[in-house]
């Protein structure tokens, strides 16, 4: 079974510019916990640290069947990207107002991947305009 977790708030809070696929380094108990469910993207973001991309704030609940080897739910997790992609992200993040937001966590084959989006935060009036356009499209579709 292929479980996909999405960050629904990212589409509302940010204007998503460009997407990247990254591997994620997980421990054994984290993998089992992700398969069991309950991943939470609230407050999750990615950042560059010493040439590595790290994912902060992603909540993966502790695995109930694990013993003393259980993981910390909100630990910093390393993301695996090609060197060229990291360079591209570094240049893009130097621009004012851009951030790196996780949008999806999914399984591809036997490994887990995170979809990252280069994003710019929306202002309140932008959110209202997007909501009005969405409502208008919904009404037109109903006619």
Curated annotation (Swiss-Prot):
Keywords: Cytoplasm, RNA-binding. One of its GO terms (molecular function) is RNA binding. InterPro entries: SmpB, SsrA-bd_prot, SsrA-bd_prot_CS. The keyword RNA-binding applies. GO terms for biological process: trans-translation. Its main location: cytoplasm. GO terms for cellular component: cytosol. It holds the Pfam family SmpB. It is found in: Cytoplasm. PANTHER family: SSRA-BINDING PROTEIN, TMRNA-BINDING COMPONENT OF TRANS-TRANSLATION TAGGING COMPLEX. Required for rescue of stalled ribosomes mediated by trans-translation. Binds to transfer-messenger RNA (tmRNA), required for stable association of tmRNA with ribosomes. tmRNA and SmpB together mimic tRNA shape, replacing the anticodon stem-loop with SmpB. tmRNA is encoded by the ssrA gene; the 2 termini fold to resemble tRNA(Ala) and it encodes a 'tag peptide', a short internal open reading frame. During trans-translation Ala-aminoacylated tmRNA acts like a tRNA, entering the A-site of stalled ribosomes, displacing the stalled mRNA. This is SsrA-binding protein.
């Amino acid at each position: 079974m292929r479980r996909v977790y999405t960050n629904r708030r990212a589409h509302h809070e940010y204007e998503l510019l460009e997407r990247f696929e990254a591997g994620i380094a997980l421990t054994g108990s984290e993998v089992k916990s992700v398969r069991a469910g309950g991943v939470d993207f609230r407050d999750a973001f990615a950042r560059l640290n010493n040439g590595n991309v790290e994912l902060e704030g992603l909540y993966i609940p502790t695995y109930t069947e694990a013993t003393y080897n259980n993981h910390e739910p909100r630990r910093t997790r390393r993301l695996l990207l090609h060197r060229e992609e990291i360079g591209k992200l570094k240049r893009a993040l130097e621009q004012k107002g851009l951030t790196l937001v996780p949008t999806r966590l999914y399984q591809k084959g036997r490994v887990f991947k995170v979809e990252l989006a280069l994003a710019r935060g929306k202002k309140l009036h932008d959110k209202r305009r997007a909501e009005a356009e969405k409502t208008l499209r919904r009404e037109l579709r109903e006619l």
